[in-house]
Amino acid sequence: RSGEIKRRRIDASVRRILALKLERGLFEDPFVNEERVDEVVGTPEHHAAAAEISDRTITLVKNEAGLLPLEPDTGRKVLVTGAGGYAGSAADQGDRSTLGSLAAAMEEFGVETEVYETGTDPDASRRSTAVAKAQNSDLVVVTTNKAWTSEGQQRLVKELLATGRPVIVAAVRDPYDLAYFTEAETYLAAYGYKPVSMEALARVLFGAVNPTGRLPVTIPEAEDPNAALYPYGHGLSY
């Protein structure tokens, strides 16, 4: 209650850390064998595990319009827009950015996509361009990245919803964003913006994976942080 930590508690924590290092042999051989990196890091087994974990964590928070799951192989034109977060790396093949990864994964289900990244704080010009592209699309998927801190992102979502086109909102970082555009009828939380999360999101959107994720936190109302908009543990399935 005082905010002070007893020395014996710190000592106990340090002992646990040192015991684990001893168990792992880090005192005898503390360095990484760089020649074995390719054998250990990024193996097919690791990628498969990451995909499975991502599939299980995507959370369908709202599906009020019954828009999901999407029907595959329709050839419909989908605008993939909004905030990114991941720009890819030099080792990536093709466009592995947040939106690029999502678009590519959606195209595997037989739709045509257009990517337009607006960034995490879109100005009026970028929002206007996104709206124009939305009006020429059959469906819009907009990603948000901590939109609760960005009025530009909040306005973007509201302006896209105002087009009358079907809009899917996917938070690619915190799930709290929904509190700032509660009129969105279709909302998911992906918790990540790298390719593995975007590929899992696409599988959920098209029903290849039935969403089983649950909110790990409560989403509070924007105007009253003590009131729950969606409670801890909430999550929908098909």
What are these regions (language model features)?
Residues 1-238:
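Preference for extracellular/luminal or secreted protein segments
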